[in-house]
Amino acid sequence: MAKLNQQYQNLILQIKQDADKFADQQMQTVYKNQKDNLDEIHKYIGMLYIKNAVDGLLKVTPYQKNNILSDLNSKLKDMAKDMGNTEINQVTDILKKNYSDTYYKNAYVMDSGINVNLKFDILKKEYIDAAVNNPLDGQIFSNRIWQNKATVVDKVKQGIVDA
């Protein structure tokens, strides 16, 4: 097997690094959304404590507890839905852009480094969509995101109930 010229190895590595950097930059929107929702939970818990603390302990009747848990469950589900939609939209955009960019950049590097005339067709939208929605480990990424959000809601709710 022929050894790949170091110059082309570096170009291909740079394509990957550029894609990673783009993804990291674009995910900042998702991270901010997650932070905003975390702050909202902290405020909710703080207000709950301020309204119901007696001698430094949270004191609620069983009726109040049921209302609090119902309200908490509703808030957490709304937050998870918001975070899931934000993440899916952002990740979809990142995957589509990176798939397209890396295809064309790699095609250029390969075409410039090989003495054979290669033909790289224009990448059709349906090919990009198929690649983005291709299952990984039996699941498409959006299903994995929704499952992760459901798990987070369950763990946060349980953590608050246990506290």
Give the label of every model feature segment:
Residues 1-161:
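N-terminal leader/targeting and assembly helices and adjacent pre-domain segments
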